[in-house]
Amino acid sequence: MKRTFQPSNLVRKRRHGFRARMITATGRAILKKRRAKGRHKLSA
């Protein structure tokens, strides 16, 4: 059985990156929350 985590920087950026977050309203809400919390890193 193969492991479930098969790292790929491209997939990581496409799924969890800043531009991916900005596309949807929910994603923008996530960024807003992270800014409010004071996170230094907003997205992957």
From Swiss-Prot:
Keyword Ribosomal protein: yes
Protein name as catalogued: Large ribosomal subunit protein bL34
Similarity comment: family membership: Belongs to the bacterial ribosomal protein bL34 family.
GO cellular-component term (any): ribosome
Species per Swiss-Prot/TrEMBL record: Rickettsia prowazekii (strain Madrid E)
Stored HAMAP family: Ribosomal_bL34 (MF_00391)
UniProt keyword Chaperone, yes or no: no
Alphabetical keyword list: Ribonucleoprotein, Ribosomal protein
GO biological process: translation
Molecular function, one GO term: structural constituent of ribosome
